[in-house]
A protein has these predicted regions:
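Alpha-helical transmembrane segments and immediately membrane-proximal extracytoplasmic
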Residues: 1-423
């Protein structure tokens, strides 16, 4: 009995020390990500308002592209993106601290001059870089820096959207599809809550949509499933277009300076052809109108797809997540009523489903629905989201994601089995 108590006491001390170490990491990560995330949110918000008041700024997009190319060359961050941060979680690959100012300024310039991009891709890169480098500063091991990278991603996502639980699960599940990097949950959630608290203290309201949902029934469940299946096609199409253009643009225009100017000019021309302002920037106003007012144009999702793919493939910065919200919400708003579902509710199903299909993150997407919509229609949204997840295949934004299990089969993938053998 005495030996048993000694072992238990030793074990308790050990796990307490480990927990304290993770909290030591979570506090500065949450504070720094909260502060930088708040500054980033305010910067993007202000330049978006300024661009709306000064439409002529759109004509400066090619010049902004040149500035971004110069900025990335100056900081040595050429070619770095969200995939690098995900690889850091997989293997402990280093993440440059200069990625933070590079993606911060690059995204602000993109939004100032009307590029069609989001914020969350930038948030994942900045958060991952901050978490990794704080762990490096504290002399954490290479393996523990992987956890720190995931914590930073969760904290920055939380600061921007005000969804700490979804942000945490996203940060620990986006790397390996079908597996949760569970050791990062407690420090990641602590960092996310701290970052969320910092953003609230600075006056940043969490993202929330008012949503009226139909009653749960066999009919509405079937319709939500059909809508989810349609969203899987949209998700596949968006990811295919992104990857195709990101491959073709550098092949056809290998000079990054020329690519930025030509791509920027093309975005300007298409913006005037499609409607200045509607497809530029993140488009949160259009998303809100689709969900809360049931208003969207039939071609909105296609126009946003094209402009976002063109913007990002030309070298502008931001991300794909908020554009996926836009595409899903506007598609759902238009397609859902054809099935007999309310337009606003269909927009909510579309937003979550396309996001889920494009990021391959089922559980975080369902939690995001809860935090964005306050639980309204959660069962139906989760059903549509689940169907979209299963039918979206291995298509996704992030080529560095590893698929631990097949989406439609109860077995590990060959790539995961190979990875286990290497360890």
């Amino acid at each position: 009995m005495k030996d048993f108590l000694k072992k238990e006491l030793y074990s308790l001390r050990a796990v307490t020390a480990i927990l304290a170490r993770w909290l030591l990491l979570a506090v500065p990560t949450g504070l720094v990500c909260g502060a930088v995330g708040t500054a980033f949110h305010l910067a993007v918000e202000h330049v978006t308002e300024w661009r709306g008041e000064h439409v002529w700024l759109l004509w400066l997009l090619p010049l902004a592209g040149l500035a971004i190319v110069a900025l990335y060359k100056l900081t040595g961050c050429e070619g770095m993106g969200t995939n690098n941060v995900i690889r850091a979680v997989h293997s402990g690959e280093s993440v440059s601290p200069l990625l933070v100012p590079a993606i911060f300024l690059g995204t602000v310039l993109t939004h100032l001059c009307g590029g069609s991009a989001g914020r969350e891709g930038a948030a994942l890169q900045m958060g991952g870089s901050i978490g990794y480098n704080i762990a490096k500063l504290f002399r954490f091991s290479d393996h523990d820096r992987r956890t720190a990278t995931a914590c930073g991603m969760a904290a920055f996502f939380s600061a921007l959207f005000g969804t700490p639980l979804a942000a945490t699960l996203f940060g620990i599940m986006v790397e390996d599809v079908g597996l949760a990097f569970s050791v990062a949950f407690v420090p990641g959630f602590a960092a996310a809550l701290i970052a969320y608290g910092v953003s609230l203290a600075c006056g940043i309201a969490p993202t929330h949509f008012g949503l009226t949902a139909p009653a749960l029934s066999i009919d509405t469940a079937l319709l939500a499933a059909v809508l989810g299946a349609a969203c899987a096609l949209v998700s596949r199409g968006f990811c295919w277009l992104l990857h195709t253009m990101e491959h073709e643009m550098p092949r056809r225009l290998p000079n990054p300076w020329v690519r930025a100017v030509v791509g920027g000019a093309a975005v300007v021309a298409l913006s005037y052809l499609m409607g200045v302002g509607r497809y530029n920037g993140a488009g949160m106003g259009v998303i809100t109108a689709a969900i809360e007012q049931g208003q969207a144009l039939p071609w909105d999702f296609l126009c946003k797809m094209l402009l976002t793919a063109l913007t990002l493939s030309a070298g502008f910065k931001g991300g794909e997540v908020v554009p996926s919200f836009y595409i899903g919400a506007t598609f759902g708003c238009v397609f859902g009523p054809l099935l007999g579902l309310p337009a606003g509710f269909s927009a909510a199903v579309g937003l979550i489903s396309v996001f889920c299909g494009a990021t391959n993150t089922l559980i975080p997407s369902i939690l995001l629905a809860y935090e964005l919509f306050g639980g309204a229609g959660l069962e139906l949204i989760a059903l549509g989201c689940g169907v979209c997840y299963m039918l979206s295949g291995t298509h996704g934004f992030y080529s560095s994601q590893l698929f631990v299990t097949e989406k439609l089969l109860s077995e590990y993938t060959a790539s995961w089995e190979e990875r286990l053998r290497h360890h």
